[in-house]
Amino acid sequence: GEPPRSFHWQWRDKDDVFHRDGALTPREFFDKYVAYPLDDLVCLIHCPMDGRAFNRLYTIGHLGNVAEGDIVRYLNVDLATFKQAAADMIVKRSEPVWFGCDVGQRFNRDLGVLDLDVYDYALTYGVTHTAGKGERLSYAHSMMTHAMVFTGVDIDAEGAPTKWRVENS
């Protein structure tokens, strides 16, 4: 639907004290409570598809979430750069990092496990998956299906990220 022209915002703080503010326009809310320098950030993707060069800007059709909003541009980077940028945001800026991923194929909800080897397709079906990420993206066998946030990272002695703490919705 159409976004509200103004709204009242109410919340309880960490001490369970009730607060209310408004009427606020969306812009007033952003300026008062968010005031984040969004123009200082860039959206990164790791898309190793044929014909999608690294260090170039791309858009993704049907991925915008604001009618008549700005086109979102993504900088396609290699995986090492992607991981290092996310780690730097967490370690150097104390900022969580939003990310989108494909959880539909390798997720076992009952176990709460997201792992590339959660299912043994070779044992069950007698086949193995040999397509790489780029091929899976090219054939729409893989796509962003879920969003989560990196909230922590372990760094090895060389400064490289080794494992991530993920906050799921």
Which residues fall in each region the model found?
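Long non-globular sequence segments
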Residues: 1-169
